Regions:
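Activation-segment/catalytic-loop signature of the eukaryotic protein kinase fold
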Residues: 104
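AlphaC helix of the protein kinase catalytic domain
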Residues: 124-135
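Conserved short submotifs of the Hanks-type protein kinase catalytic core
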Residues: 109-122, 126
């Protein structure tokens, strides 16, 4: 992710594509299914008021697992600008402790945001599972340094995350932190 700029037009329908190669909006579900495996067996990672998040992989690079946020335009109505803002923010950010944004697909009914899959779960769950055990002071310092580094990067890009909490910090399977949720979930 180098010098990316977003030109997301959430109000358009299928058949209209625009944007640069990295942030290009593509023609909805058909194009999405050409590049990613999406079917009735696709794992649902989560569900919110505006849609669902699915875990899948790229058909051309099966090792590239992704999370696809599928958002209903009809449920979003008054929040379409927030989606545009989230994409604009994610295209600015390139940091090892911030979720990576790959691309957007849009059709008449849905907006599909393709992002990095983070397989280790929420920091909140890691804290809750530890019951009487807490993170060591050394581990806590390492995690806080990484979180501060991500915040410093965001601030340098003019971005302020207004909802940093354990539920919005994911852990990779290798134990790395990734800050998520820059708009609507």
């Amino acid at each position: 992710m180098n010098s990316k700029s977003s030109s997301l037009d959430v109000n358009k329908g299928a058949g209209e594509a625009k944007g640069n190669a990295k942030t290009q909006e593509k023609q909805g579900a058909k194009e999405l299914k050409r590049n990613y495996v999406i079917d009735q067996n696709t794992e649902v990672l989560g569900q919110g008021a505006f849609g669902k998040v699915f875990k899948t992989y790229n058909k051309h690079n099966k090792e590239l697992q992704v999370a696809i946020k599928v958002l209903s335009k009809s449920k979003l109505k008054d929040h379409l600008e927030a989606i545009k803002d989230e994409v604009d923010i994610l295209t600015k950010l390139d940091h090892p402790n911030i979720v990576k944004y790959y691309e957007t697909y849009i059709d008449e009914r849905y907006i599909y945001l393709v992002m990095e899959y983070i397989g280790g779960g929420e920091l909140f769950d890691k804290i809750a599972q530890s019951e009487n055990q807490t993170f060591t002071e050394e581990d806590s310092q390492i995690y806080m340094r990484k979180l501060f580094s991500a915040c410093n990067h965001m601030h340098a890009q003019g971005v302020v995350h207004r909802d940093i909490k354990p539920e919005n910090i994911m852990m990779t399977q290798e134990g790395e932190l990734k800050l998520i949720d820059f708009g609507l979930s």
